[in-house]
Amino acid sequence: MRESLTYETGLREECGVFGMFDLEGGDVARDMYYGLSALQHRGQESCGIAVCDTNGPKGVVNCYKGLGLVNEVFHEETLKRLGGNLGVGHVRYSTTGSSTIENTQPLVLKYFKGTLCLAHNGNLVNAFEMRRQLEETGAIFQTTMEIGRASCR
């Protein structure tokens, strides 16, 4: 007996992630905006940019995010306020978790070693089990995304 192969048809996307570092210390926010615009076909629910100045105060991260398209969320004055030479950006196409501002990435996490910015474009296969186990040990989650679960490890 011969097995038949089934192929998915149609567009199937996941989130888009864009990172940038300017060695000369220049502001990356505007270029991040253009990078996310180019990736926007991968996610149109929400977007965000987190930047820091590697020559400035340690642990200071400026983050701006919102629901909607890149050009709806970011405006000239917002990009100017972000300021920094290191950044990560994200456009979201949700496969798990609801489309809320809490689930918009990048996530900015503060922990005992400093500040961490996190963005991803995939799914964890054991996300629900991982969350249950972590909650049993006292972990508290602010989002319904899998990335929050992974960041607690």
Predicted regions located by residue number:
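Conserved short alpha-helical segments that host acidic/polar catalytic motifs at enzyme active sites
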Residues: M1-R153
